[in-house]
């Protein structure tokens, strides 16, 4: 697969590996990812990403430790045998990390989640400072209307994704291809609500370049998907 965006300044190539795994009926494929830039300043990069078959959600497992996995190559560097060996070593390490991602996904899928804990999770991901006010207001979705702070829109959107809906201009619309139909009410499903929001909703449906850059370079705005995974794991094993 190849994606060109931001007036052809950014090009991303995806090559499927043999790292596919299943969580029940949910299917996650693993890809090698090569990012090339025509900006005059950015380095080309090589890393890996995991993509859900059902909803095209992405998760850059390698983003959690750029020094371990990510390789940056300028256009001025000559491709030598030493560089070739380095790249192969880094790619092998990154592919092994996909096994870790499978274990994490399994852990999340083994922990059921209820409505109030679901909202608490989204708050902890997007703005933990809201939690005291949210709990003071009695928790539950209605409590969010009495809470003030940043990223409330993202929290509400994730909650909507859980229920396959999105609100816009006072109206509710049905979301398609969320992957909820193949997931149980677990932290794995909750985590995927965050990745769906970051990949498909945040930034607006008319700003494809912005969303693709979020998907392929930062693991969601401010690397939020990594935080979502770490938070879900903490709650799932508590």
What is each stretch, according to the model?
Residues 1-12, 18-20:
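N-terminal "first-domain core" detector
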Residues 12-13, 32:
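A broad, low-specificity signal marking well-ordered, structured residues that form hydrophobic/aromatic
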Residues 18-238:
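Intrinsically disordered, low-complexity regions enriched in serine/threonine
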């Amino acid at each position: 697969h190849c994606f060109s965006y931001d007036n052809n300044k950014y090009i991303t190539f995806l090559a499927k590996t043999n790292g596919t795994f299943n969580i029940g009926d949910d299917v996650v494929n693993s890809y090698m990812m090569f990012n090339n830039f025509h900006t005059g300043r950015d380095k080309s990069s090589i890393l890996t990403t995991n993509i859900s078959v059902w909803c095209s959600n992405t998760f850059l497992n390698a983003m959690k430790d750029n020094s371990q996995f990510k390789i940056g190559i300028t256009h001025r560097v000559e491709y030598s045998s030493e560089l070739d060996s380095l790249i192969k070593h880094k790619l092998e390490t990154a592919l092994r990390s996909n096994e870790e991602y499978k274990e994490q996904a399994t852990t999340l899928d083994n922990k059921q989640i209820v409505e109030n804990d679901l909202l608490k999770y989204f708050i902890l991901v997007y703005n933990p400072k809201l939690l005291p006010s949210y709990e003071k207001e009695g928790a539950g979705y209605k409590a969010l209307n009495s809470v003030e702070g940043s990223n409330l829109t993202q929290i509400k959107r994730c909650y909507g994704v859980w229920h396959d809906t999105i609100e816009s201009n006072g109206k509710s619309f049905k979301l398609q291809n969320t992957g909820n139909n193949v997931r149980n009410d677990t932290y794995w499903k909750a985590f995927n609500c965050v990745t769906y929001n970051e990949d498909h909703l945040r930034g607006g449906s008319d700003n494809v370049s912005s969303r693709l850059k979020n998907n392929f370079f930062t693991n969601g705005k401010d690397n939020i998907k990594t935080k979502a995974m770490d938070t879900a794991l903490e709650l799932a094993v508590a």
